[in-house]
Amino acid sequence: HCPIDYLEECLSHFWGNKNFYSIDLYGDELAQPIENFKGIYRRAKKEGLRLKAHVGEWGTAKDVRTAVEELELDEVQHGIAAASNESVIRFLADNKIRLNITPTSNVLLGRVADMSEHPIGKFYRSGVDVTINSDDVLIFDSDVSKEYLRLYEAECLTAKELDDIRIKGLR
């Protein structure tokens, strides 16, 4: 939405501030090419920040891979579009890219038909590092505990799998 030079100017006031742990890109992921943010992410990496971006909630599996490669991401917020492409799933697993997934949001926004069909199980069983999160608590009436319970009740993930995801997510 914003011109890149405007974002660069805004961020110039924060570079070097050790109170920041990461950088994240969010908004309409299809508004402009992800490559436009490459310079900002190179600087963020130089500053030692963890690199994240909201991608793959609405786009394609190719968009997820492109974002990871172009921005050198450590983590992807959402990323569920990757489920449609086995080579992208393997790429995420092989490169240890974490997907921070918000199941209830994905169902309510129509990105996944229902919780039992959520691709988080596929990602987990394919070796992709996943975390379970809530998205906009007041809008989706959810929190992390409810997300775990809903995935379990839908038989998307077993109790053992959910516990493993929980433990790995704390690292």
Question: Can you annotate each of these PLM segments?
Answer:
Residues 146, 156-171:
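Mid-to-C-terminal alpha-helical segments outside catalytic/metal-binding sites
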Residues 1, 26-30, 56-60, 79-81, ...:
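Active-site beta-loop-alpha junctions enriched in small/polar residues
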Residues 103-109, 131-133, 149-154, 169:
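Short beta-alpha connecting loops at secondary-structure transitions
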Residues 4-22, 29-72, 83-97, 114-128:
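Histidine/acidic residue-rich metal-binding segments in metalloenzymes
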Residues 52-54, 77, 100, 131-133:
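Structural detector of well-ordered beta-strand residues that form the stable sheet scaffold
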Residues 62, 85-86, 109-110, 141-142, ...:
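Short secondary-structure boundary/hinge segments and terminal tails
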Residues 116-153:
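C-terminal hydrophobic structural anchor segments
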